[in-house]
């Protein structure tokens, strides 16, 4: 078994030094590895296939700071040899199994401790496990400081922990990307957990009622059927389970919500079966997610959104192509766009067909003619802002866009997606770059499409004028939605932007609700 075992801080530092040209994908565990850990390691390994100079490091460190009782710490499974075998078979390159002294030289009192914000700690597990998440956060920060990985892989089973660690990494500005994987379950539906080995056969039969009840609730919610938490609690108690909590909370801030008024929330539970405490959850979602990506011309929205759609299996809608199509038709028929009567006639007769797919491709047809390539010409580009500012055009196309997105499962890009078309989108992004950067990208696109290319200074001038027109028009001007996240892409390649977008998406939409494609 060609698996490197690291025991000390010095050994870790030497290994990292040897791999300084490699990206490190880090899977932190406390040992007792099971199928859930295997999936984490396999996912980390899949990134190595995309980036050949990547390494997978798995840590095994039973963290005493996160246990409520000394007895629980002593009872935690310690199966190091089996853990190494599981990690190796799943694709790990190295195991780091440090002592407490290696992680906290001179003892924990000699180091800073992290205190989790009360708002993230007062409900669910945090309400009854005082200091637990403080201990988790403290150790994770320490591990990240020692390993300095590019990515960290965490499971969605411990959703509260995942939310806390995401905010911790964001607040501290740590240079690591979080990748989450959906809860892995055994054949009977019970989520994989190191604690499952403590269940007797009879207890196991009882506790499977927990995932069954949660799954039934999620299905009922999707079908717009009522959910009664008290009835669910009674059902669990009838199976001899002691319910610690059963709550619906917001996915990100973890505050209680009325599930009847929510589009997407977490239904979480903790139960005691005999001497074993177990957690599980489900997600209540009424429709598939919508992502709105806005931004100025030349910011790379189309390229990025296509790849983003492919990765997530979302339908891709380029709303700018719809305005380009109308602009092309107006030019083709020599119509003055300011002539309202002529424009009304052409809008009434137009048959604009957008062929959508989750492959990132979009075909544009007008009255049966494929104009997908024609609408990208400089002639159309020079006039599309003027046409897009016309009220009757926006009204017709916005209505069509809303209809296309009525069932969700879609990512749309344009100028006013998050403000006018899909103001209730689960995720809103404002993708932008400097005018200089956008001019360079525009020049590359024009060359690829076989069009003549103006100078960079001329392209920059055109882009700034396009920005002015888009931002100053009376109807649906280009603007960042109040709840949108701005992403400036200067100096980033397409893959980096897409990976960052997926990470932002995962803060809103779990893998269990909408999984990432394996491609």
Curated annotation (Swiss-Prot):
The protein's matches in SUPFAM superfamilies, at most eight in alphabetical order, are given as: Nucleotidylyl transferase (SSF52374), P-loop containing nucleoside triphosphate hydrolases (SSF52540)
Sorted keywords for this record are:
ATP-binding, Cytoplasm, Kinase, Ligase, Multifunctional enzyme, Nucleotide-binding, Pantothenate biosynthesis, Transferase
Chain positions recorded as (R)-pantoate binding sites: 66, 161
User: Has UniProt tagged this entry with the keyword Ribonucleoprotein?
Assistant: no
Protein location: Cytoplasm
What this protein catalyses is:
(R)-pantoate + beta-alanine + ATP = (R)-pantothenate + AMP + diphosphate + H(+); CMP + ATP = CDP + ADP; dCMP + ATP = dCDP + ADP
Residues binding ATP: 30-37, 155-158, 192-195
The annotated active site, in chain numbering, is 37 (proton donor)
Spell out the residue ranges making up region: Cytidylate kinase. 283-519
Q: In which pathway does it act?
A: Cofactor biosynthesis; (R)-pantothenate biosynthesis; (R)-pantothenate from (R)-pantoate and beta-alanine: step 1/1
Note down the stretches annotated as region Pantoate--beta-alanine ligase: 1-282
Which molecular-function annotations from GO does this UniProt entry contain?
A: ATP binding; CMP kinase activity; dCMP kinase activity; pantoate-beta-alanine ligase activity
**GO CC terms, sorted:** cytosol
Q: Name one Pfam family in it.
A: Cytidylate_kin
What name appears for this protein in its UniProt entry? Bifunctional pantoate ligase/cytidylate kinase
């Amino acid at each position: 078994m060609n698996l490197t075992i690291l025991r000390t801080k010095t050994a870790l530092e030497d290994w990292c030094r040897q791999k300084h040209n490699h990206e490190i994908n880090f899977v932190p565990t406390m040992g007792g590895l099971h199928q859930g850990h295997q999936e984490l390691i396999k996912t980390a390994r899949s990134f190595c296939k995309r980036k050949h100079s990547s390494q997978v490091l798995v840590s095994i460190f039973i963290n005493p700071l996160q246990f409520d009782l000394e007895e629980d710490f002593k009872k935690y499974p310690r199966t190091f040899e089996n853990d190494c075998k599981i990690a190796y078979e799943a694709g790990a390159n190295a195991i780091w199994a440090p002592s407490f002294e290696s992680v906290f030289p001179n003892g924990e009192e000699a180091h800073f401790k992290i205190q989790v914000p009360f708002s993230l700690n007062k409900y669910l597990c945090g309400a009854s496990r005082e200091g637990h998440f403080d201990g988790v956060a403290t150790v994770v920060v320490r591990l990240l400081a020692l390993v300095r990985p590019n990515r960290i892989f965490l499971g969605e089973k411990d959703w509260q922990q995942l939310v806390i660690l995401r905010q911790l990494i964001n607040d501290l500005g740590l240079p690591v990307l979080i990748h989450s994987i959906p809860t892995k379950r055994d054949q009977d539906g019970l989520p994989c957990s190191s604690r499952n080995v403590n269940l007797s056969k009879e207890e196991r039969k009882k506790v499977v009622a927990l995932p069954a009840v949660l799954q039934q609730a999620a299905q009922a919610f999707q079908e717009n059927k009522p959910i009664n938490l008290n009835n669910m609690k009674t059902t669990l108690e009838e199976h001899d389970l002691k319910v610690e909590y059963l709550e619906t909370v917001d996915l990100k801030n973890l505050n209680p919500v009325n599930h009847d008024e929510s589009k997407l929330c977490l239904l979480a539970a903790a139960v005691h079966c005999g001497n074993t405490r177990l957690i599980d959850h489900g997600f209540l979602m009424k429709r598939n997610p919508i992502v709105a990506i806005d931004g100025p011309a030349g910011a790379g929205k189309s390229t990025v959104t296509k790849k983003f759609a492919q990765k997530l299996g979302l339908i891709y809608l380029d709303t700018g192509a719809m305005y380009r199509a109308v602009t092309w038709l107006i030019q083709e028929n020599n119509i003055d766009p300011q002539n309202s009567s002529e424009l009304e006639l052409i809008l009434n007769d137009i048959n604009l067909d957008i062929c959508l797919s989750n492959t990132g491709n979009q075909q544009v047809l007008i009255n049966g003619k494929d104009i997908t390539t024609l609408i990208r010409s400089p002639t159309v580009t020079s006039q599309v802002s003027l046409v897009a500012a016309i009220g009757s055009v926006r009204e017709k196309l916005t209505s069509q866009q809303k209809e296309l997105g009525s069932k969700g499962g879609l990512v749309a890009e344009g100028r006013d997606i998050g403000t006018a078309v899909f103001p209730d989108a689960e995720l809103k992004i404002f993708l932008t770059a400097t005018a200089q950067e956008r001019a360079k990208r525009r020049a590359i696109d024009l060359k690829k499409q076989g069009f003549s290319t103006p100078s960079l200074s001329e392209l920059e001038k055109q882009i700034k004028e396009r920005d002015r027109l888009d931002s100053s028009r009376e109807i649906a001007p280009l603007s960042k939605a109040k709840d949108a996240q701005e992403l400036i892409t200067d100096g980033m390649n397409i893959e980096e932007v897409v990976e960052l977008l997926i990470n932002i998406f995962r803060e809103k939409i779990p893998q269990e609700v909408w999984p990432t494609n394996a491609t």
